[in-house]
Each structure stands twice: as structure tokens, then as C-alpha cells.
């Protein structure tokens, strides 16, 4: 039996909750063995992560960089669910303290679940480009100053 809307939303929200904790193993437990993570827009130049090991390194980098990290569905937005395609679209707010100061941004996450609706098979992340560009410069300056 295909997953229900409620099951798909539950998996998506649980994934976001674990992502916000930056508990790498918990985040990875929600990813199917063949999960692909993609960041958009393409102009950000971030390659797709094709394996759990690549994803693990990426999530570990976030954990090392952020403190008090928060991810949540933006107030006033509701998940958009395509049950036959097993997709959930979320408007996410991200906040936290980092090595280079306070971080606040928005994302659109498109999560496609496995046939059971229990794991993420594809994770598409659309980032706020203006914030990402500004942060890229701050991060670059931070690490340049350390070298």
C-alpha cells in the first residue's frame, strides 16, 4: 500500500528535525542507500552528493560550523504533498550561530520518499541565493584569515 499524505509529511518533518539537530548519524538514517542530494540554483556550483559517505562529510561540515542551528517550516506555510510521486515540498526557515556570525535564510526543500514513505530518496534544496552569496564571502574571508 502506498504511503499516505500523513506518513509522507511525518517522514519529511522528522528528517528536518534530525537535520536541525545536526546529528549526522540520525540525518543519514533518513536517507535511502541511493539518496541523491542536490542544491539549487545550479549557479551555486554545488555538485550533487551521490552517496551516503559524501552526504556524511557534508553534514559533518555543517555540524562543525554551526551552533544553535534551527530548521523549521516557515510560519504560514503548509507542506505541499504529491502522494503518487511520494514528494513533499516544504518552505523552510534556517537560523543559527556560526563561526562567522548569525545565519538566517530560507530554503525550499523537495523530498521524494522511498516506496514505503519512510526514507528520503531524493533531496532537492533550493537556497536563498543572496544569503548564500554573502555567506560564501564571509566563509572565504574567515578561512583565508586562518591560513
Curated annotation (Swiss-Prot):
Domain of life: Eukaryota
Annotated GO biological process: terpenoid biosynthetic process
InterPro entries cross-referenced by the UniProt entry: Fungal_Meroterpenoid_Isomerase (IPR050977), NTF2-like_dom_sf (IPR032710)
Pathway(s) the chain acts in: Secondary metabolite biosynthesis; terpenoid biosynthesis
PANTHER family per record: AUSTINOID BIOSYNTHESIS CLUSTERS PROTEIN F-RELATED (PTHR39598:SF1), AUSTINOL SYNTHESIS PROTEIN F-RELATED (PTHR39598)
Subunit structure, as described in the record: Homodimer.
Family listed: Belongs to the trt14 isomerase family.
Further comment found in the protein's record: In A.calidoustus, the austinoid gene cluster lies on a contiguous DNA region, while clusters from E.nidulans and P.brasilianum are split in their respective genomes. Genetic rearrangements provoked variability among the clusters and E.nidulans produces the least number of austionoid derivatives with the end products austinol and dehydroaustinol, while P.brasilianum can produce until acetoxydehydroaustin, and A.calidoustus produces the highest number of identified derivatives.
Known function: Part of the gene cluster that mediates the biosynthesis of calidodehydroaustin, a fungal meroterpenoid. The first step of the pathway is the synthesis of 3,5-dimethylorsellinic acid by the polyketide synthase ausA. 3,5-dimethylorsellinic acid is then prenylated by the polyprenyl transferase ausN. Further epoxidation by the FAD-dependent monooxygenase ausM and cyclization by the probable terpene cyclase ausL lead to the formation of protoaustinoid A.
Protein name (Swiss-Prot/TrEMBL): Austinoid biosynthesis cluster protein H
Taxonomic lineage from the root: Eukaryota, Fungi, Dikarya, Ascomycota, Pezizomycotina
Amino acid at each position: 500500500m502506498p504511503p499516505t499524505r500523513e506518513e509522507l509529511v511525518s517522514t519529511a518533518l522528522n528528517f528536518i528535525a534530525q537535520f536541525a539537530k545536526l546529528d549526522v548519524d540520525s540525518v543519514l538514517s533518513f536517507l535511502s542507500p541511493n539518496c541523491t542530494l542536490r542544491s539549487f540554483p545550479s549557479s551555486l556550483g554545488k555538485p550533487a552528493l551521490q552517496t551516503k559517505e559524501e552526504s556524511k562529510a557534508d553534514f559533518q561540515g555543517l555540524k562543525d560550523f554551526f551552533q544553535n542551528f534551527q530548521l523549521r517550516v516557515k510560519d504560514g506555510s503548509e507542506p505541499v504533498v504529491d502522494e503518487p510521486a511520494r514528494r513533499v515540498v516544504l518552505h523552510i526557515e534556517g537560523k543559527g550561530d556560526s563561526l562567522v556570525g548569525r545565519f538566517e535564510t530560507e530554503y525550499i526543500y523537495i523530498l521524494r520518499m522511498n516506496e514505503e514513505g519512510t526514507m528520503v530518496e531524493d533531496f532537492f534544496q533550493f537556497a536563498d541565493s543572496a544569503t548564500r552569496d554573502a555567506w560564501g564571502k564571509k566563509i572565504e574571508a574567515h578561512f583565508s584569515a586562518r591560513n
